Amino acid sequence: MKLEEIKKFVAELRGLSQEELAKKENELKKELFDLRFQAAAGQLDQTARLNEVKKQIARIKTVQSEIK
């Protein structure tokens, strides 16, 4: 993700409620699980997507802690 995309993503997150953030986090965790499974099976083409999803989850957790 480019810096502009990251800023847009974080701004979007800040507009969400706690429940919506939790839902988005769960979706990304499921995607991360699927990506890890594909990587273990040797079927993953976009290996950079793993790190991107991890960082998005961390951004969500950061916004959640800001709200609290």
Swiss-Prot record:
InterPro entries on file: Ribosomal_protein_uL29, Ribosomal_uL29, Ribosomal_uL29_CS, Ribosomal_uL29_sf
Example of a GO biological process term: translation
Gene Ontology CC: one annotated term: cytosolic large ribosomal subunit
One Pfam family this sequence matches: Ribosomal_L29
Keywords: Ribonucleoprotein, Ribosomal protein
GO molecular-function terms, A-Z: structural constituent of ribosome
Keyword Ribonucleoprotein found: yes
Family: Belongs to the universal ribosomal protein uL29 family.
NCBIfam families recorded: L29
Protein name as it appears in the record: Large ribosomal subunit protein uL29
Organism: Streptococcus thermophilus (strain ATCC BAA-250 / LMG 18311)
